[in-house]
Amino acid sequence: MVADIKGNEQIEKYSWREACDTGSSRMDRKHGKYILNVEHSENQPPITHPNDQEAHSSICWCLPSNDITSDVSPNLTGVCVNPGILAHSRCLQSESCNTQVKEYCRNDWSMWKVFLACLLACVIMTAIGVLIICLVNNKGSANSSIVIQLSTNDGECVTVKPGTPSPACPPTMTTTSTVPASTATESTTSTATAATTSTEPITVAPTDHL
C-alpha cells in the first residue's frame, strides 16, 4: 500500500510536465517584453527534481497559440513556465524601477545642492563687498581736514590745519558789541552841545558906579 501511494504521488508530480511536451525554455528581457524561445523536442525525457518542493513549484501552463506573441513560433502548443522565474523577473523589474527612481531623486537633490551653494556664495560675496565699502568710507571721513581761520593784527587771515604747528603771531581776539542806533545818536548830540557851551566866551560888562 505504501509503495502504491508513493507511485501515485510521483505520477501526479510529473503529470503536468509530461502533458506539456516542451524542450528547453529561455527567457530574455528585451525592451520591457519577455520573449520565450522554446524548441519543440519529442525525444527529450522529462526533467526530474530530487526535492518535492522544487517539483511542486514548477507548473506547466498550456497556452493556446492565439495568446502567443509574434516572436514565438506559431507551432508552439504549450509552454512550461516556472512561477518562481516569473516572480524573480517581476522582482528584478521592480528593483530596477526603484533604482531608477532613486537615481533620479539623487540627481535632483544634487542640483538643489549646487543651487543652494551658489546662492550662499553670492550672499557671502555681497556682504564682504558692503563691509569693504563701509570701511573705506569711514577711513575717508577720519582723514578729513579741519580748517581754522584766524585774523592777525595786520588783517591777514591765517589757516591752521590739524597736525601743523600754529603760526608765530598770536591771533587778536576782537569783540564786537551791538549798540542800538538811537542811543548812539543821543550820545553824539550831547557831546556836541557840551562842546559848544564850553567854548562860548563869557563877557562881563563893567559897571562904574560911584
Swiss-Prot record:
Topology Cytoplasmic: residue spans: 1-113
GO biological process: activation of protein kinase B activity; cellular response to ergosterol; positive regulation of cell population proliferation; regulation of apoptotic process
Subunit structure: Interacts with DCTN1 and DCTN2.
One Gene Ontology CC term in the entry: plasma membrane
Gene name as annotated: DYNAP
Membrane topology of the entry: Single-pass membrane protein
Compositional bias annotation for Low complexity: 171-203
Chief place where the protein resides: Golgi
Extracellular side: 135-210
Tissue specificity remark: Expressed in fibroblast and numerous cancer cell lines (at protein level).
Transmembrane segments: 114-134
Name of the protein described by the UniProt record: Dynactin-associated protein
Pfam families, A to Z: CLLAC
Function: Plays a role in the regulation of cell proliferation. Promotes activation of the AKT1 signaling pathway. Promotes phosphorylation of AKT1 at 'Ser-473'.
Region (Disordered) residue spans: 168-210
Annotated compartments: Golgi apparatus membrane; Cell membrane
InterPro entries: CLLAC, Dynactin-associated
Assigned keywords, A-Z: Cell membrane, Golgi apparatus, Membrane, Signal-anchor, Transmembrane, Transmembrane helix
